[in-house]
Amino acid sequence: MDSSDSSCQEWCSHGQYWLELGPTDLMERKGSLTLRSHHKKYSKPVLVYSWHRDRETYPKDYDIEGPEEVKKLCNSTYRRLGTSEPPVWISETREKMAQVCLNTKLAKIKSKALLNEETMNSGIIERDTGLPATGFGALFTRHSPDWSKMCTLTTYAEEYAPPYEYQPLGDPCQDDDYSIVHRKCRSQFTDLDGSKRVGINTWHDESGIYANSYVKRKLYSLTGGPIAPFLK
């Protein structure tokens, strides 16, 4: 029996056979496939590397095995945001991306405009190049004068043209004798209820100023009395 044990130890002493046997503490090593550990239970931390260590970012208030009698699972370490942190919270990604602005080598070159007061000169565009201004061979492409004719021309104006030329009647509102004095404006004191109030501000207006007040003061003299004269 002793001879067999000595031969086994001699056989295992060679380095090439150590990987075949494997470590002797495989069943007790933390992080092994058996997950045999005396101070840790199977939970979310075992899914990552170094699961047997206490994670710093793990919410301490979410520990269901804590000493508190009443568990508050809705609380977490993120409750401290807004108290010990600055008022404007900046994410870690934004903080790392802002390092580009601090490094002068990575700073972007200011873009320069192609057209400015110096480069924009009408003489450059309107110079005589010896080429036709429009049409084939022109340096700058331009639309023909009747380019927008298709947009303004309608079927009615094209097919139903008037057979004779005539002078259309002018707008009566453009006459010099036209006035809005005779129009009755909506009273601000008697016509209170109604849906014809214009504008955004629809509250009761008691200013006494109407749309034709300026025209009435211009047409009627203020010394003639309160009764307006009859106009023929």
From Swiss-Prot:
Residues 1-96 are extracellular. Expressed in trachea multiciliated cells. It is a single-pass membrane protein. InterPro entries: CFAP95. The keyword Metal-binding does not apply. Residues 153-163 are annotated as: Mn. Residues 116-232 are cytoplasmic. Keywords: Cell membrane, Cell projection, Cilium, Cytoplasm, Cytoskeleton, Flagellum, Glycoprotein, Membrane, Transmembrane, Transmembrane helix. It is found in: Cytoplasm, Cytoskeleton, Cilium axoneme; Cytoplasm, Cytoskeleton, Flagellum axoneme; Cell membrane; Cytoplasm. It comes from the Eukaryota. GO terms for biological process: flagellated sperm motility. The chain crosses the membrane at residues 97-115. Its main location: cytoplasm. Pfam families: CFAP95. One of its GO terms (cellular component) is plasma membrane. The keyword Cytoplasm applies. Glycans are attached at residue 75. PANTHER family: CILIA- AND FLAGELLA-ASSOCIATED PROTEIN 95, PROTEIN C9ORF135. Microtubule inner protein component of sperm flagellar doublet microtubules. Interacts with MYH9. Interacts with MYH10. Microtubule inner protein (MIP) part of the dynein-decorated doublet microtubules (DMTs) in cilia axoneme, which is required for motile cilia beating. This is Cilia- and flagella-associated protein 95. It comes from Bos taurus.
